[in-house]
Amino acid sequence: RSRGLGDVYKRQMLDVARNFTKKADLLKLIDILSFYKMNVLHLHLSDDEAWRVEIPGLEELTEIASRRGHTTDEQMCLYPAYAWGWNETDTTSLANGYYSRSDFMDILKYAKERHIRVIPEIDIPGHSRAAIKAMNARYQKYIDTDQSKAEEYLLTDFADTSQYLSAQNFTDN
């Protein structure tokens, strides 16, 4: 069978995990992709540096892992990465932000109306430090009151004695 143009992926990958793109700017990008007859938008939504999409019931992913700033324990935000994120309350920074469930549904609908398929990527099990740290914060939040809830989504094995250093100098991902 010969392939028609409709079978070809003309794609754009956007890494919003490391450098967040606000919804309005993402919608503009979708318009540009449509203008150039591109048909796939690959969104890199998570990585070691951040988590960018709301998951109902796991608010720590966005309350903690969508922000970078000064911290000693990463219970409120993640360490700055790639020179971004010195102030976790700066909503204009490329380091901070996430798409709410409603935002993400709007993005999907907007893209579909322009014949663009969105491929959301959640990078696991590797490159999961943002999720790991968020679930550690969740563990700390509940361990004194509800051990079952504290451990339900825990991604850390406290008995693991592995020693390593990632490319970003992390020892816990």
Q: Regions from the language model: what does each represent?
A:
Residues 2-9:
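Short, small-residue-biased leader/transition segments that mark boundaries at the very start
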Residues 4, 37-39, 57:
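Short loop/turn motifs at secondary-structure junctions
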Residues 10-17, 88-92:
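Short acidic, glycine/Ser/Thr-rich loop/turn "cap" segments at secondary-structure junctions
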Residues 10-14, 41-43, 118-122:
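Hydrophobic faces of well-ordered beta-strands that scaffold small-molecule active sites
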Residues 15-48:
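A conserved hydrophobic secondary-structure block that centers on an alpha-helix together
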Residues 17, 117, 124, 129-132:
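Domain-scale activation on soluble regions of proteins
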Residues 29, 107, 118:
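Aromatic/hydrophobic pocket-lining residues that form π-stacking "cages" and hydrophobic walls in ligand
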Residues 49-113, 128-173:
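Aromatic- and acidic-residue-enriched carbohydrate-binding clefts of CAZyme catalytic domains
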